[in-house]
From Swiss-Prot:
It is a single-pass type I membrane protein. The gene is GINM1. This is Glycoprotein integral membrane protein 1. The keyword Signal applies. It comes from Pongo abelii. InterPro entries: GINM1. It is found in: Membrane. It comes from the Eukaryota. The lineage of its organism: Eukaryota, Metazoa, Chordata, Craniata, Vertebrata. GO terms for cellular component: membrane. The chain crosses the membrane at residues 269-289.
């Protein structure tokens, strides 16, 4: 898939954060306290399906998206960061007659892609903007088409919600559309309440540490083959190591995000200092040139006085030896 343009999204994120911040600065009021209750957004997603006779049927898929204690839930199913594909039972509103707008509500099994992305607003701060997008893939085993995406933006700090709002944008311009479906995290367990033990959940890309021996059998729909039952595996050192490495990766990313600005500032100071010193030295050489070349050692002229050797034995060394022999004989 081709990448969607990020210009409108970046502008919305900037306005989403700048508008409340500017209000706090101008009024001089302190930062508003977090909302007491967890935000709960029941959104309706407009989709179209193709009937057996070739007619187009318009339907609405109702999803209940909540945020509580740093965790995003979709129909009480915990969803982590990234793109997760879940299959769950939810309410579907079907328009039987478009002229009279007669609606028929029923519960069906839907397959939906959920994007959860966390945007750190400032380095070293717990202020984050959580972006949630959703795309319905199937309803009761039938392919559907979706044109618009409802984006939910939640501004949180220390797991407390400061503000949340909804936007509607075309599917082609969303981040979810630009991410390939091959990288989705599959979540095929039935709808479990978030009040139950989350440790019994098992996905195809992440495993929680809890010894659970159970299998989940899927209710086979008409015209659909059953999937292989999932069995929770006992904990192993490999899974624990994967969790440690994931935590280490997040800590390392947080560390580099705080170190990089300081490193680049230091590098900027070094480059500016070396360049400035070279310019100053060049200017000084031009203004005050050196007349003498100091590379050659210059010596003062010294008068050389010849030294004459004085011979203490003018008769030669042979006569001196004879005189010594005569004195010895005497």
């Amino acid at each position: 898939m081709e990448g969607a343009p990020l210009g409108p999204l970046a502008l919305r994120l900037l306005l989403f954060v700048a508008l409340p911040a500017s209000g706090w600065l101008t009024t001089g009021a302190p930062e508003p306290p977090p909302l007491s209750g967890a935000p709960q957004d029941g959104i309706r997603i407009n989709v179209t399906t193709l009937k057996d006779d070739g007619d187009i049927s318009k339907q609405q898929v109702v999803l209940n998206i909540t945020y509580e204690s740093g965790q995003v839930y979709v129909n009480d199913l915990p969803v982590n960061s990234g793109v997760t594909r879940i299959s769950c039972q939810t309410l579907i509103v079907k328009n039987e007659n478009l002229e009279n707008l007669e609606e028929k509500e029923y519960f069906g099994i839907v397959s939906v892609r959920i994007l959860v992305h966390e945007w750190p607003m400032t380095s070293g701060s717990s202020l984050q903007l959580i972006v949630i997008q959703e795309e319905v893939v199937e309803i009761d085993g039938k392919q559907v088409q979706q044109k618009d995406v409802t984006e939910i933006d939640i501004l949180v700090k220390n797991w407390g919600v400061l503000r949340h709002s909804n936007y509607t944008l075309p599917l082609e311009e969303s981040m979810l559309h630009s991410i390939s479906r091959d990288s989705d995290i599959l979540f095929t367990l039935p709808n479990l309440s978030k009040k139950e033990s989350v440790s019994s959940l098992q996905t195809t890309s992440q495993y929680l540490i809890r010894n659970v021996e159970t299998t989940v059998d899927e209710d086979v729909l008409p015209g659909k083959l059953p999937e292989t039952p999932l069995r929770a595996e006992p904990p192993s050192s490999y899974k624990v190591m994967c969790q440690w490495m994931e935590k280490f990766r997040k800590d390392l990313c947080r560390f580099w995000s705080s170190v990089f600005p300081v490193f680049f500032q230091f590098l900027n100071i070094m480059v500016v200092g070396i360049t400035g010193a070279a310019v100053v030295i060049t200017i000084l050489k031009v203004l005050f040139p050196v007349s003498e070349y100091k590379g050659i050692l210059q010596l003062d002229k010294v008068d050389v006085i010849p030294v004459t050797a004085i011979n203490l034995y003018p008769d030669g060394p042979e006569k001196t030896a004879e005189n010594l022999e005569d004195k010895t004989c005497i």
